[in-house]
Amino acid sequence: MSLVILGVDPGSRITGFGVVRVANGKIEHINHGVIVMDGDDAFPRRMTELGSAFREVMEKYKPEQVVIEKIFLGKNADSAFKLGHARGVIMYEAGLGGAEVQEYATRSVKKGVTGNGGASKEDVQAILKVMLSLKTISRIDASDALAMACYHAFEMKKKALMQRAVSL
């Protein structure tokens, strides 16, 4: 049995995505990329572009699980609100596509993938290249999304092992 997981690094201008398949306990890279919205467009138009492009990704890869970064409040409240809108568009489209949506904090993902919750984006990318046997990952946004997908696969495996251990 295999499971397709789509990781998403949401953004109001650039959204990264990473698709992996989990089969027989192994994580296989399927694809990764970015959805780039026209920065000159008004914000509502960018959200429409994001929805349309993300729907195409959902239709192409048909993931059972979509994993998205939890929102965090930085110094700029406007950026956090825009990120919230992008997350909403993605969650809506994921739900329409029949996928279950999971959320993880960035720090948890970094710790799960690299062993260090404060790892740099470049460190995460380097580990993923080795883990998934990739020569390059074109954009940091895409590697962040792949990290989300891989971390979810780790968490699912951990939960399955715990359930087996409890039933012994």
Swiss-Prot record:
* Cofactor comment text: Binds 2 Mg(2+) ion per subunit.
**Which residues make up the binding site for Mg(2+) 2?**
E69
Q: List the catalytic activities from the record.
A: Endonucleolytic cleavage at a junction such as a reciprocal single-stranded crossover between two homologous DNA duplexes (Holliday junction)
Binding locations of Mg(2+) 1: D9, D141
Q: Which Gene3D superfamilies match?
A: Ribonuclease H-like superfamily/Ribonuclease H
Its subcellular locations are:
Cytoplasm
The biological processes this protein is annotated with in GO are: DNA recombination; DNA repair
User: Per the entry, which co-factors are needed?
Assistant: Mg(2+)
Function according to Swiss-Prot or TrEMBL = The RuvA-RuvB-RuvC complex processes Holliday junction (HJ) DNA during genetic recombination and DNA repair. Endonuclease that resolves HJ intermediates. Cleaves cruciform DNA by making single-stranded nicks across the HJ at symmetrical positions within the homologous arms, yielding a 5'-phosphate and a 3'-hydroxyl group; requires a central core of homology in the junction. The consensus cleavage sequence is 5'-(A/T)TT(C/G)-3'. Cleavage occurs on the 3'-side of the TT dinucleotide at the point of strand exchange.
The UniProt family comment states: Belongs to the RuvC family.
- What protein am I looking at? Crossover junction endodeoxyribonuclease RuvC
Source organism per UniProt: Bdellovibrio bacteriovorus (strain ATCC 15356 / DSM 50701 / NCIMB 9529 / HD100)
| Gene giving rise to this polypeptide | ruvC
